[in-house]
Amino acid sequence: MSLLKTLAPKAGSKHAPKRIGRGIGSGMGGTATKGHKGQLARTGGTVRRGFEGGQTPLHRRLPKFGFSNVAFANNFEIVNVGQLAKFSGEVTPESLHAAGLISKGAVKILGNGELKTALTVKAHKFSESAKKAIEAAGGKVEVIK
C-alpha cells in the first residue's frame, strides 16, 4: 500500500481564502472591507505612488542634492610589479591584455612584488614604489597618454 495517499498538510497550516462581498453572514459583506464611501471604496480607486492628496509631494518639496562622478571617473586597471616578472623586453598594455592580466582601459603599475629582469614598461600611470622597483632592476619607465 502506498503512503502517498496518507500525506496531508499540517493541521492549521492551510487557510480558506477570504470571500469578500458575499453577504453579511460571511463577516466580509456590506462594505467588503473597504470602509464607507470615499475614493478607496470605489472601483479602481487607488492613488498613484507618491500622491499626497494634492499637497506638493515630499519628493518635490525636497531639493536635489549630491553629485555622481561615475561618468568622469578615471578607472585604472591595476598590475603589480611582481606580475611583470614573466615578461621580457617591453611591457605594453597590449601585451598585458594578451597575457590576461587586464581587460581593457588605462593601466596603473603598483610596486607590490619583486622584479629581477630589466624591462621597458609602458603604462598610463606608475606609483613611486613601482618606478623605483623597475629602475632598480635596470629597466625603464615610460608614461603613455
UniProtKB/Swiss-Prot annotation:
InterPro entries reported for this sequence: Ribosomal_uL15, Ribosomal_uL15/eL18, Ribosomal_uL15/eL18_sf, Ribosomal_uL15_bac-type, Ribosomal_uL15_CS
GO BP term (any one): translation
Gly residues: compositionally biased ranges: 22-32
Region feature (Disordered): 1-55
Key words of the record: Ribonucleoprotein, Ribosomal protein, RNA-binding, rRNA-binding
MF terms (GO), sorted A to Z: rRNA binding; structural constituent of ribosome
Recorded coiled-coil stretches: none
Subunit-structure text: Part of the 50S ribosomal subunit.
Database matches in NCBIfam families: rplO_bact (TIGR01071)
HAMAP family registered for this protein in UniProt: Ribosomal_uL15
Name the UniProt record assigns to this protein: Large ribosomal subunit protein uL15
Taxonomy of the source species: Bacteria, Pseudomonadati, Bdellovibrionota, Bdellovibrionia, Bdellovibrionales
Gene name, Swiss-Prot/TrEMBL: rplO
